[in-house]
Amino acid sequence: MARRALEGPEPLEGRTGSELPATLAPRSGNGGGSSEDSADHEGAQTAAPRVAVHATILRVLVTTLGDALLDVVVRLDEPLAVGADAGAVTKSGAGGQAANVAAWAVALGAEGRCIAKQGDDAAGRLVAAELESRGVELVGPAGGRNGIVVSLVGKDGERTMASDRGVAPELAPGDLDPVWLACDCLHIAGYSLLASPIDAAAFRAAELARLNGATVSVDLSAWTRIREFGPARFRRQVELLEPDVVFANEAEWEIVGAAYGLAPTAVVKRGSRGVLVLGEKRLELPALPGEVVDATGAGDALAAGFLVGGPELAVEAAAQCVARLGAQP
């Protein structure tokens, strides 16, 4: 968890609002230790949207590594039928787990940087422009075809995704500038551990971030991709990364074999039932009431909230996300 102070609503039980939970400190107290896995756009950040949550969050830098995709969200008025024409409401813009977490971090009052390989096509330029407008510093090589993800959203807000990651998995260790890893927290999309050379880039990024005293977190991402990759093989990838915090939904949690042993702190995303945090203490927080328009990106908003301000901010950010169409604030 980023080194920050959170002030505002009632503190979590057992700590004041300005304390950093000990379970979220880096594995190595001096910032080094693990062998495996800056925002300059201040002008853009002043114009970026902010989500009204807590009164004061000291500015920290959350760096993410993974995908910066073109996100096409299709909210269906009725179920699809082969050969038929179904009504829908659509929205397109920047997406991808790494991009989403960085954008939400900025919206919640932090600084956000996203490390990703981007396409040099129209989709890539659109994504880069939108992230910049949101105050996110997008860094990494550009070339080839940008990834696109299509999310089909039903009336209940649940989504089904079709993902084309484009050039994103081609990010290599040699593409990294150590300056990008001067941050408070490095958040790695689990998709980055499912392909090469981006997995090696993730491990190298974690090394560099820890040299700067940062914590490292990972979101296990899609259980279907983990199943295809091999759960035991994927778990080994996470173990090599040695994260301080692991995020997972319940399906991902189960398929990897209960992720608690993978990190000092585990955050289980339970949808409408809220969040479960396992560390030195067990903490359950319910989801906040409200209409669910679109669940796309809710887990990313939750992760950003947790890294910036802890569990309370996590559930608030998730509630903000599901109340609108699209994955970004």
Label for each model-derived stretch:
Residues 56-115, 122-129, 149, 289-292:
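Glycine-rich phosphate/adenosyl-contacting loop at the front of the ribokinase-like
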